[in-house]
Design a protein with these regions (language model features):
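ATP-binding/phosphotransfer module of carbohydrate and carboxylate kinases, centering on a glycine-rich
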Residues: 1-66, 74-78, 96-104, 118-133, ...
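A charged helix-plus-loop insertion that forms the helical arch/lid used to bind
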Residues: 79-91
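Histidine-centered metal-chelating micro-motifs
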Residues: 142
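Glycine-rich nucleotide/cofactor/substrate-binding loop typically near the N-terminus or early
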Residues: 70
Length: 243
């Protein structure tokens, strides 16, 4: 696979359980080949993750630019936190590490920020004015804040103290539901409380729900109550991080 016939990048999404990638047409957001997924190595050290990035580059015979997302606060190419990956990523020059491993130019962005940006350009928030929040419900809760089409990076709304003396992603993430065997009714109630909290803080105009659990959005979105904004599933489903 090469990028010679169209404007494209290799999109790679690094997650706690899987690292997936696909070449993406940057004008349409469409995949140019079937996505490829590799299990995240354990421990997910910089060296181990770098080897997977190189494996994806080789799989697609890629020679161009890479856009890579990461489950951490990313600032000026540095990862300032480490969610669901090895702690050695904290304060690491992650963009340089991964670019060196790939042997290609690479741009690094927080995973939820990248998903939100993809929804702004190609998906559910395309043309949306005002404040849009995207949350990704997975191993944790990622977030993106878009104001009049502009991304405000590294919001980390999953780490808000909620409901009491804890953080939101320990209360209503996809992993919490799965690990506890929580029924949809209880999960919906917890998510509803969290969204009401975000409503008080930010008064968003639109809420987009992504992450793996968004595949079953009909189980919980219609039951949400008391919100002054629309809640919609991500158009790009669980591939938004790649796009």
């Amino acid at each position: 696979m090469t990028e010679q016939t169209t404007r494209a990048v290799l999109g790679i999404d690094i997650g706690g359980t899987g690292i997936k990638g696909a070449p993406v047409n940057i004008d349409t957001g469409e995949f140019l080949a079937e996505r490829h997924r590799i299990e995240t190595p354990q421990p997910a050290t910089p060296e181990a993750v770098g080897r997977v990035i190189k494996e994806l580059v080789d799989h697609f015979a890629w020679t161009g630019v890479i856009g890579c997302t990461f489950p951490a606060i990313v600032h000026n190419g540095m990862t300032l936190s480490a969610a669901n990956v090895d702690a050695s990523w904290v304060d690491a020059p992650a963009q340089d590490i991964l670019a060196t491993a790939a042997g290609l130019p690479l741009i690094l962005l927080n995973d939820a920020d990248a998903a939100g940006l993809a929804e702004v350009v190609f998906g559910a928030a395309k043309g949306q004015s005002g404040k849009t929040i995207m949350i990704t419900l997975g191993t944790g809760i990622g977030s993106a804040l878009i104001v009049d089409g502009k991304l405000i990076t590294n919001t980390e709304f999953g780490h808000l103290v909620f409901p009491k003396n804890d953080i939101a992603e320990k209360y209503c993430s996809g992993k919490v539901k799965e690990d506890s065997g929580m029924k949809w009714g209880e999960f919906t109630e917890r998510l509803n409380q969290y969204l009401l909290h975000l409503q008080v803080l930010f008064s968003p105009d639109l809420m987009i729900v992504g992450g793996g659990i968004s595949k079953k959005h009909e189980k919980f979105i219609p039951a949400l109550k008391g919100l002054r904004f629309a809640v919609v599933p991500a158009d790009l489903k669980n591939d938004a991080g790649i796009v």
